[in-house]
Amino acid sequence: MRAKNHLQTALKAVVADLELPWPDKVSIEPPKDKKFGDLAANIALVLAKPAAMPPRELAARITERLQQKYPEISGVEIAGPGFINVTYAPDFWHRTVHMVEQAGGRFGSVNVGNGRKVQIEYVSANPTGPLHIGHGRGAAIGDSLARMMRFAGFETSTEYYINDAGRQMLLLGASVYYRAKQIKGLDVAEPEEYYRGDYIRDIASEVLGFTPDLLEKPEEEALAVCQKYAVDTIMAGIRQDLADFSVSHDVWFSEKSLVETGAVDKTFDRLRRSGLAYEEDGALWFRTTDFGDDKNRVLKKSNGYLTYFASDIAYHDNKYDRGFDLCVDIWGADHHGYVPRMRAAVQALGKPADSFDVILVQLVNLLRNGEQVAMSTRAGEFETLADVVKEVGADAARFMFLSRKSDSSLDFDLELVKQRSMDNPVYYVQYAHARICSVLRKAAERGTTPETHSDEELLKPLVHADEIDMLRLVDRFEDTVEAAATSLSVHHISYYLQELASALHRFYANHPVLNAPDEQILKARLALLRAVAQVLRNGLDLLGVSAPEAM
């Protein structure tokens, strides 16, 4: 926020003039009530003791100097025990329009990352069936987080971890094999555990099509054929579903490759050498209790099978070997108990605890006609992501997934999302952009187009409280991006966009732009609206949502 940075710089200069130290815990934030100004600072409260004077007396000295040295500050008041409330003159806010015009699509970008290498792993659904709506929420969060981190100065790579090894893959192959037997009319007992969806039957039919002698092959060979084709087919569908959802990954990493390249054994050797892995009862254990876990964990079972944890440690070892400074995993909330042991593993690999973070994504409650839609991959009773995107569109689905904190459950109302009304959040924001574009088009048709670069004289008429409110919000976009990037929380962007859209719609209702009292006010307001449209576009792009020019 330019205003926040300006006030901090001004206060530092004043504090230096008073020959006082700059304290650590200075708060400069917009007050809850706008009547108290644009920003409130607690500088006098935290400096009172070093200055050896009452906070209000110190605040008086600070405010006097602020008013003397900074003409862009139009008002300073002391509140309560010594808070300093600052109000900026309109021309200070007018400069925000210039900044948007100069930066364009980069307005709001910050360099908090400073080139640090970040890897974000998301979706990583088992290739045992189509993506469901819960996967869609994780996909939207991961893809948007990657966009935002790049915008915030991080060198960002995205990855999908393909769980193509282990028991689930064996079960998938067996499910297809069972269905193939059914198709051929064999009287076979239904397995106690298998994947039941229609997609399994479709895959079995395709396997029989190119391998008509499947059931004549040795069972082990037939199962291998079924498993490989099923994994390849399902992964192709997953890739397509994500592409249709405007989600991409830079790397698709195979779990199987960890075993085939010896990466798992290499990680085991590293843990043994550091005394963190040990043999007991024929199994290999990891001392996760050394890092705060509630018990030690098995890496390799006594029957020789690897645990998921073993592969995950080797996988993260591989991530750090590729030079990432921060690894972010996006998991379903049902994996919350897995977080402490993975943190332990990262520290055991010799990496800082803060080099690894997990975003937990809560469930999506999909509603249709007021009733919740059941989702179970094995039972085949789930609403696929592809179905939802086809019904409501990628834009609406993405925005809804990003409209709440990731760790909060989300009610996804299919009927609401399809409505072209102000009750629909994505429509509300997109329509704000389309509404501005419509005003700009109509103004151009009448022969009035805002200047490419607005000068101070042109913007002088912008003094109404509604206009200043929008300028404040535009100025705050950079702060929002920084907060979202540092907290790994993309919902900050969707919240901000809804607030900015609300200000725009309110302004539009109260001030019919094309009916402005005179040409000067019209041109100033057109410049303001064009800046707001740019910020809406930038924010929507971070969410992977389009900014239509007409709706």
From Swiss-Prot:
Cellular component, GO, one term: cytoplasm
GO BP annotation list: arginyl-tRNA aminoacylation
Gene3D superfamilies for the chain: Arginyl tRNA synthetase N-terminal domain (3.30.1360.70), HUPs (3.40.50.620), Isoleucyl-tRNA Synthetase, Domain 1 (1.10.730.10)
Main location: cytoplasm
Keywords tagged on the record: Aminoacyl-tRNA synthetase, ATP-binding, Cytoplasm, Ligase, Nucleotide-binding, Protein biosynthesis
Compartment list: Cytoplasm
Sample GO molecular function, one term: ATP binding
Motif ('HIGH' region): 125-135
One family name in Pfam for this protein: DALR_1
Enzyme nomenclature, EC number: 6.1.1.19
PANTHER family the record matches: ARGININE--TRNA LIGASE, CYTOPLASMIC, ARGINYL-TRNA SYNTHETASE
Quaternary structure and partners: Monomer.
Family: Belongs to the class-I aminoacyl-tRNA synthetase family.
Name under which the protein is recorded: Arginine--tRNA ligase
Organism expressing this protein natively: Oleidesulfovibrio alaskensis (strain ATCC BAA-1058 / DSM 17464 / G20) (Desulfovibrio alaskensis)
Top-level taxonomy: Bacteria, Pseudomonadati, Thermodesulfobacteriota, Desulfovibrionia, Desulfovibrionales
